[in-house]
Design a protein with these regions (language model features):
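Non-catalytic substrate-recognition and accessory regions of acyl/acetyltransferase enzymes
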Residues: 1-54, 129-148
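Acyl-donor binding region in acyl/amide transferases
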Residues: 41-120
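Intrinsically disordered, low-complexity terminal/linker regions enriched in Pro/Ser/Gly
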Residues: 104-148
Length: 148
């Protein structure tokens, strides 16, 4: 994320209490993440221009959770993903995020489900709440997440 985007992406997440800072048992930072709960219109707008400044309504206006920012510079990506599925979004049928190497491999939406949601319930929700994408984008449902 460019530095000039911090004011529109990171600070509102903190103000809305939609961020997490994961720490190791020794007190070292493992990961930082921020999320929003989009409605379908905000989701479509985000997918059209994911560097846009979100309005206050966009941060918590719907039931489509999106990880907007995730950084694990010291190797805490696995712990962060596990924490997301087991704690933060444990009851969510799906949480979405953009693949971090989209410029190299093409835009992709990755999807995970919370640990308390069955694979069938997640798949049903996914099929009923497909992202409205105008630009070509690949949608990847995490098969491993669905199966276990």
């Amino acid at each position: 994320m460019p530095l000039h985007m911090m004011a529109s992406q990171i600070f509102p997440a903190i103000a809305n209490k939609q961020y997490a800072l994961g720490m190791s048992e020794k007190g070292s930072p493992l990961f930082y993440m921020a999320w929003a709960n989009f409605d379908d219109a905000a989701e479509a707008e985000y997918l059209t221009n994911y560097n846009l400044a979100l309005t206050p309504h966009n941060w918590n206006g719907g039931d489509r959770p999106w990880i907007l920012f995730f950084a694990a510079p010291f190797g805490g990506a696995y712990e962060g993903e596990r924490w997301i599925k087991e704690n933060l979004f444990k009851d969510s049928p799906e949480v979405r995020f953009l693949y971090h190497e989209g410029k190299k491999r093409g835009k992709r939406i990755l999807c995970k489900r919370g640990k308390n949601v069955s694979a069938m319930a997640s798949l049903k929700w996914h099929n009923e709440n497909m992202p409205l994408v105008a630009a070509p984008m690949q949608l990847e449902k995490d098969v491993a997440s669905l199966l276990g």
